[in-house]
């Protein structure tokens, strides 16, 4: 109400599983104007840093947050050529088991803490611990 501009900065893109979306809804509901400036989604940045394309040719891709449940992840793995699994750190061991059972662990790239000091981008390492900002790109391969 003091005629000031404020900024809310987020990692990745504000439109993809960002806490910022909830804050923006409250700000709009309170009667304030907003402007959203797009960012680079973490999985796009991670794929570029890993040197892998997310999709090629006629391949399909799903983006699934692990907090939506392991069944959602399994469904995506069953129905899409490539799957991005976001916010994977909390249940990573259970996820390794699913990927092992489906023979997909060696087709998985891990992006952990992209752009941060402790960034890890590389193959799945079941002995390594991963945090909240962990994204997996599972490339099953498919239609070219």
Task: For the regions a language model picked out, list residue spans one by one.
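Sparse, context-dependent recognition of short Cys/His-centered cofactor- or disulfide-binding micro-motifs
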Residues: 5, 46-48, 62, 68, ...
């Amino acid at each position: 109400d003091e005629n000031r501009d404020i900024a809310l900065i987020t990692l990745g893109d504000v439109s993809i599983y960002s806490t910022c979306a909830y804050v923006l809804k409250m700000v709009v509901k309170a009667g304030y104007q907003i402007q959203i400036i797009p960012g680079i989604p973490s999985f796009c940045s991670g794929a570029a840093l890993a040197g892998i394309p997310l999709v090629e040719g006629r391949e399909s891709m799903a983006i699934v947050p692990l907090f939506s449940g392991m069944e959602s992840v399994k469904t995506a793995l069953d129905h899409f050529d490539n799957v991005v699994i976001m916010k994977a750190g909390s249940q990573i061991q259970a996820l390794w088991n699913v990927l092992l059972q489906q023979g997909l662990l060696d087709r998985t790239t891990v992006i952990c803490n992209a752009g941060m000091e402790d960034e890890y981008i590389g193959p799945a390492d079941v002995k390594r611990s991963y945090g909240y900002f962990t994204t997996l790109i599972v490339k099953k391969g498919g239609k070219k």
